[in-house]
């Protein structure tokens, strides 16, 4: 199995007392550290129109990551596919792949925030069709010869994208989502599926409790394999990506939660708003406002501790999925002091080495 480090959102909070330039420079240093300690990938994500500076320019950020590193894979999880022009995305992703020497993985999904669709003058009702046509254009653009795509949303005929990606056929296309339709789409069009293991996930609902991670992974994997079989695709040795939030600390789970909780609850408030959870619910997600029971619920959403605490979690997940599992472990959160995050990354490297 593999472990990647996520997510690099490029956010800069006032509490950090730094410029955005400094925060981004720190993030590139953290990517170098992830490579040095033996992690398999770093993951960059996309959203728009947030005062925190959440990164919208996801491929330029990936290009900077490619130049800052030499071995680790450079992943995007995820680009909001319906908001992108397919030829522009094909060119940018191919360029990152060439720049990195064939280390790029491109994750895509539909997106869901109305403000982002409005900002790009795109109808949310068209998002599935736009994503599917975008995939068709990407596949053509990364092959040989000129494009010939005449669809409902895009007409791209006669031009050819250069340079071609370093990886034959282009970067692996990973597809994320929550609904059964997303699994079916990934099996039909993608190279792998990205499952949201819990952090920032709508599966929490208003209760916020991470319900049966292992059962959900097993169930989602089974549905993905069924969808692959329906497409006549292999179901053994499946590549399966799982996002999982948490934090590592030398002193164990309590210390890890103490380091993480302010930043994590900030992130949960943001996503609670995005997912349409009532403000009277997520508006209370501050450490000083939560009841002891609510604290326990929030804490249950993430994997916490020293390496010896995380290893059983990773081994159990590997036993369910197999060696094709890639865990995108999120211990990179806005607002946590750089040195504290760096130590968490170092400890995550210990977990990766222990897994072999």
Regions found by a protein language model. Give the residues of each.
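Active-site-adjacent structural elements that line small-molecule/cofactor binding pockets in enzymes
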Residues: 1-356
């Amino acid at each position: 199995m593999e472990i990647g480090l996520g997510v690099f959102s490029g956010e800069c909070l006032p509490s950090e007392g730094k410029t955005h330039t400094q925060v981004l420079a720190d993030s590139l240093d953290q990517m170098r550290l992830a490579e040095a300690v033996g992690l398999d990938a770093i993951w960059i994500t996309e959203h728009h129109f947030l005062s925190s500076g959440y990164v919208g320019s996801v491929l330029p950020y990936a290009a900077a990551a490619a130049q800052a590193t030499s071995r680790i894979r450079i992943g995007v999880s995820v680009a909001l596919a319906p908001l992108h022009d397919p030829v522009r995305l094909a060119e940018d992703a191919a360029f990152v792949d060439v720049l990195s020497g064939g280390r790029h993985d491109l994750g895509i999904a539909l997106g869901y925030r109305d403000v982002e669709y409005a900002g790009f003058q795109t109808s949310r009702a068209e998002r599935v069709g736009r994503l599917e046509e975008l995939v068709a254009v990407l596949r053509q653009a990364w092959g040989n010869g000129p494009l010939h795509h005449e669809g409902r949303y895009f007409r791209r005929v006669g031009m050819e994208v250069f340079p071609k990606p370093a990886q034959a056929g282009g970067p692996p296309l990973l597809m994320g989502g929550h609904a059964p339709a997303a699994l079916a789409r990934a099996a039909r069009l993608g190279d792998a599926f990205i499952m949201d293991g819990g952090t920032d996930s709508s599966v929490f609902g208003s209760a916020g409790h991470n319900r049966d991670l292992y059962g959900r992974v097993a169930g989602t994997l089974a549905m993905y394999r069924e969808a692959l079989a329906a497409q006549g695709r292999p179901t053994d040795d499946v590549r399966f990506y799982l996002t999982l939030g948490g934090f590592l600390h030398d002193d164990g789970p309590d210390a890890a939660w103490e380091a993480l909780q302010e930043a994590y609850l900030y992130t949960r408030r943001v996503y609670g708003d995005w997912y349409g959870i009532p403000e009277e619910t997520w508006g209370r997600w501050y450490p000083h406002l939560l009841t002891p029971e609510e604290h326990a619920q929030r804490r249950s959403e993430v994997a916490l501790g020293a390496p010896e605490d995380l290893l059983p979690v990773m081994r159990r997940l590997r036993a369910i999925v197999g060696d094709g599992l890639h865990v995108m472990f999120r211990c990179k959160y806005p607002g946590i002091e750089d040195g504290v995050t760096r130590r968490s990354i170092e400890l995550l490297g210990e977990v990766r080495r222990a897994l072999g």
